[in-house]
Amino acid sequence: MTFLRPLAALVCCAALLALAGCIASTPPTTAEVGVLYSKGTGPMPMLLATDQVDGYIAWQPFVEVAPLAGIGKVIAYSGDLPPAGRWKNHPCCVLAIRTDLAAQNPGAVNAVTAATILATDYLQANPDESAEIVADWLAGKGDFTYGNITVSSVAVLQRAFPTVKFVNEPTEPWKNGQVEFVHALRDLNTLTGSLQNASDTEIRGILFDTQPYTAARAMIYAGRITTPPKVTRKLGIGYLMSDHDAALFVAVKKWQYFNDTYGVALRPQDPSKTRPDLVDLIVNGQKVAEIALVPGDAGPQLMQLAATDAVQFAYVGNPPTIAAIDKGTPVKIVMALNLEGSGLVAAEDSPAKDWPTFVQWAKDRSAAGKPLKIAAPGKGSIQDVMLRYALRDSGLSVKEV
């Protein structure tokens, strides 16, 4: 994804929204769209079904819930939102690791990183099976239920998977996106710590430690994972109940395959559990560490767990990770987990069927004095940013409701 450099000027002048996370006040235009912050994605299907909103922008798998439940239709996936090509391959979730663990137990950190990379490679090659694994983890392969809305978890995940790009390599364009995100958050006055006045070079040093990724990839290419010294304390991996964290779920559920094929595995202590909460890190047949798997409601909660050393690894979105690092949480971003994976949904009975017709619907409703109300997970979320930028590009203003 290509990010624009002059974010400060854009925000200060309120001429544009900065691409990698900036939320700016939108100047009045002829047509207006209301944005409602729903404090996460969980409430969105019910809000749409009960006509409290006209649509929502969310991460997967919530995008696919609406069409399968018959309450909405997908207007655009995040990579296709306007301006054309601007959001292609936009960054999303990352693997963040506490710096003290990486310094004290680099071998164990490299092994967990390798397990994640191998699981990502596996789910890229086996998307249908991986979708079922995620559905099993999230809902026991049963139904997702939101109030009186019930949909098959397997069907939802099978639709969602093709819209998420599961990747790990911390490329230079990907890093540049994170740096620009820091500039945007700085302009919002949300960064008050180490990132507030840092140069771009300093930002990179503060945010990233890609050595575990490099070491893990090297071991995978060499065909042997190095057995690290045993870790004497229990470790923790924080994660979100989202298909964006599919690599973790696949690594645990397919542990035998990874153990037999590559010599590294996250072996569940109780394989009968749909959602294991304890795993053993196994390298070349040896138990290296016991790891608790800790689900969180949102990224900030996971970063709080990391700050208190309750977890040492986090599968988490980049906005809360950057904010936590700025405040002094001792973590570094090691690699990507996925790109894209969000989408805009509109009510099933709406006249919108794609972005141009959505814009026309918004203009018609605004002219009639009944502006559309679209739910977003939270102010400053990447979904909020993409929606605001797309609306602005189409000549629509935003009002928080």
Language model features: what each stretch is:
Residues 1-10:
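Bacterial N-terminal signal peptides that target proteins for export
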Residues 19-21:
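C-terminal motif of bacterial Sec signal peptides marking the signal peptidase cleavage site
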Residues 24-53, 60-62, 67-103, 336-401:
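A conserved helix-loop-strand patch within extracytoplasmic ligand-binding domains
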Residues 32-50, 59-62, 269-304, 317-319, ...:
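Short helix-initiation/N-cap motifs at beta->coil->alpha
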Residues 54-59, 73-75, 292-295, 311-317, ...:
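Paired acidic/hydrophobic, glycine-rich loop segments that form the ligand-binding mouth/hinge
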Residues 103-192:
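Secondary-structure end/capping motifs
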Residues 179-234:
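Conserved C-terminal helix/tail region of periplasmic/extracytoplasmic solute-binding proteins
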Residues 241-290, 295, 300-301, 307-308, ...:
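Short, polar/charged alpha-helical segment
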